[in-house]
């Protein structure tokens, strides 16, 4: 772990070894702004200076890419008939004819909170995969193919941990397998990792567990334990935890 102030050259200090290593490397950032800067400016400049024919790829989550099929569906969407939405949708359609990557960050003036974005991007749930009529032109699919063939892949922390979660489920892999991963803006890793890999348990869930414990115990194992007492202990502990957490919040 290396920490240093702004402007001392942290970025170049890890990019140069990454380029010279000969290894396939993932470079992960916390923000898409730095991700774009590394791919569009810093990496090409260093690769040219060092005279290295390095294949580089930029890969973001699917919500960053235009889905051509969903854009077609959006034309028929009722909400797209609203003047403001229709105007932005027309702008997206016009841009779609010239973009190679389909990265919505290329589209100047598109607010990341725009209601059009969910209409023209896909999710894991609504993506048709290889069954999609526009699959051969799919920007997400093409971006992942380029990443698999690249020596240096620039990603973000959200995508890295999404890949870890998907791999653990045994469903698929989002990123190429590598031996070297460099995390820039690493102070945000914990928060992002918890979002994808953490589990939450509320005091309300603990109280529900106590009630379920009592019901199951009385139904299936009556007389083998003091189920009422055990359930009461769980409920009391949950209430004590809630009170302690509330007091901690007040102290902070």
Predicted regions located by residue number:
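An acidic- and aromatic-residue-enriched active-site/binding cleft used to recognize and process polar
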Residues: 5-7, 18, 30-32, 61-62, ...
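A substrate-engagement module of RecA-like helicase motors
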Residues: 23-153, 157-158, 218
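Alpha-helix C-terminal capping segments
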Residues: 16-22
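Signature of the SF2 helicase/ATPase Hel1-core->accessory helical subdomain module
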Residues: 20, 36, 41-44, 124-126, ...
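Short coil/turn segments at secondary-structure boundaries
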Residues: 2-5, 104-111, 221-229, 249-250
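Proline-rich low-complexity regions
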Residues: 17, 66-67, 176
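Walker A/P-loop
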Residues: 1-14
């Amino acid at each position: 772990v290396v920490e240093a102030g702004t402007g001392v050259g942290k970025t170049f200090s890890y990019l140069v070894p990454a380029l010279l290593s000969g290894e396939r490397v993932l470079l992960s950032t916390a923000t898409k702004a730095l991700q774009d800067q590394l791919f569009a400016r810093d990496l090409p400049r260093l690769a040219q200076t060092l005279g290295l024919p390095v294949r580089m790829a930029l890969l973001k989550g699917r919500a960053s890419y235009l889905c051509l099929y969903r854009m077609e569906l959006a034309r028929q969407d009722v909400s797209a008939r609203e003047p403001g939405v229709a105007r932005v949708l027309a702008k997206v359609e016009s841009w779609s004819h010239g973009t190679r990557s389909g990265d919505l960050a290329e589209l100047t003036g598109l607010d990341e909170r725009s209601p059009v974005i969910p209409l023209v991007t896909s999710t894991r749930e609504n993506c048709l995969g290889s069954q999609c009529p526009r699959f051969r032109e799919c920007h997400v699919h093409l971006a992942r193919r380029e990443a698999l063939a690249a020596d240096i892949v620039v990603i973000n922390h959200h995508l890295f941990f999404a890949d870890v979660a998907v791999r653990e489920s045994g469903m698929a892999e989002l990123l190429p397998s590598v031996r070297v991963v460099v995390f820039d803006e690493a102070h945000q890793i914990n928060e992002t990792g918890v979002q994808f890999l953490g589990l939450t348990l509320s005091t309300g869930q603990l109280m529900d567990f106590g009630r379920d414990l009592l019901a199951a115990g009385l139904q299936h194992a009556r007389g083998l334990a003091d189920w009422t007492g055990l359930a009461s202990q769980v409920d009391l502990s949950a209430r004590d935890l809630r009170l302690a957490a509330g007091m901690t919040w007040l102290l902070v």
